UniProtKB/Swiss-Prot annotation:
SUPFAM superfamilies: S-adenosyl-L-methionine-dependent methyltransferases. One of its GO terms (molecular function) is protein-lysine N-methyltransferase activity. It comes from the Bacteria. Pfam families: PrmA. The keyword Cytoplasm applies. It is an enzyme of class 2 (transferase). Belongs to the methyltransferase superfamily. PrmA family. GO terms for cellular component: cytoplasm. The gene is prmA. This is Ribosomal protein L11 methyltransferase. S-adenosyl-L-methionine binds at residues 152, 173, 195, 236. Its main location: cytoplasm.
Length: 301
């Protein structure tokens, strides 16, 4: 069997939304390369801008009967509609690859990931022991958040730090559902994951079932329609959407509740911190990993 491999270049701050959009458009899997600029097989030339650190290469795989020109047009349209100002996709091309080539290329990007007590394991991988580890089964590419991205890792680290047994958790922009699954496995009480995309909600439900945890997932635009209050709100999004969420998060966050945000690139950090201050959210800590930032706050009202 053959597949289409879609290859594109984009800025790092569009990496997360593009992965999510590709999944919505029917991608069978997506892989990211940060240090791709030495790959002369795929590209005829490399200029200095192309090789800058803030660019990534995205590979995404589609069934052979897919209209790839339509996929590219729809991808660009969604980016323009929802993320205008963040950039665009560049140097887009696609090619036919055989199933065995796709499978091998795909699996080499997915390995066991250890994040404190959490072990994130692709379904086809085996490890010698999971003793003292909390196992999360997660195949990459289903929707954003397979566990390997720095923003996801930092969110998992913060959940391990702040989540206490029985706490209720709201996961805004749940994507694959990985943060909801991790929260439940860490001992959370009620866990709800919300996402604006219906497909992401369906994928999250399947992942929860695979991990034998009972969670609630709901299609929602940020916190619209959410009535309950939570001990922890976690949001692995992008800076522009976090700014919108900051103005409404206290409505769903308990007094002294913890607010974990991630998906923030360096040049957007100051405006996020200013928004925390403007919305009277006390900043507890700021963490950085590979150019991405996580900001943790507290509701002190």
């Amino acid at each position: 069997m053959e597949y289409f491999e879609l290859i594109l270049k984009t800025k790092k701050d569009l990496e997360e939304p593009i992965i999510a959009i590709l999944e919505i458009l029917g991608s069978k899997g997506t892989a990211i390369e940060d240090n791709f600029f030495d790959n002369s097989v795929l590209w005829d030339y490399v200029d200095e801008e192309f090789a800058e650190r803030d660019y990534v290469l995205i590979r995404s795989y589609f069934d052979k009967d897919t209209d790839m020109e339509e996929i590219i047009n729809r991808l660009k349209a969604r980016i323009k509609e929802n993320f205008e100002g963040l950039g665009d996709v560049e140097d887009v091309e696609y090619r036919v690859v055989k199933e065995e080539d796709w499978a091998n290329e795909w699996k080499k990007y997915a390995k066991p990931i250890y994040v404190g007590r959490i072990l994130i394991l692709p379904s086809w991988e085996k490890v010698d022991t999971t003793e003292d580890k909390i196992l999360v089964i997660m195949d990459p590419g289903m929707a954003f958040g397979s566990g390997s991205h720095p923003t996801t890792i930092m969110c998992i680290e913060m959940l391990q730090k702040y989540l206490k047994e029985g706490m209720d958790v709201l996961d805004v922009g749940t994507g694959s559902g990985i943060l909801s699954i991790v929260a439940k496995k860490l001992g959370a009480g009620k866990v709800k994951g919300i996402d604006i995309d219906k497909k992401a909600v369906e994928v999250a439900k399947e992942n929860a079932k695979r991990n034998n945890v009972e969670l609630e997932f709901q299609q929602a635009n940020l916190t619209i329609g959410i009535e309950d209050k939570y001990d922890i709100v976690v949001a692995n999004l992008i800076a522009e959407i976090i700014l919108k969420l900051n103005s409404e998060v206290k409505r769903v966050l308990k007094e002294s509740g913890v607010y974990i945000t991630s998906g923030i690139i360096g040049e957007k950090l100051d405006m996020v911190l200013k928004s925390f201050e403007e919305n009277n959210i006390k900043i507890l800590e700021i963490r950085e990993k590979e150019g991405w930032f996580t900001v943790v706050g507290k509701n002190e009202d």
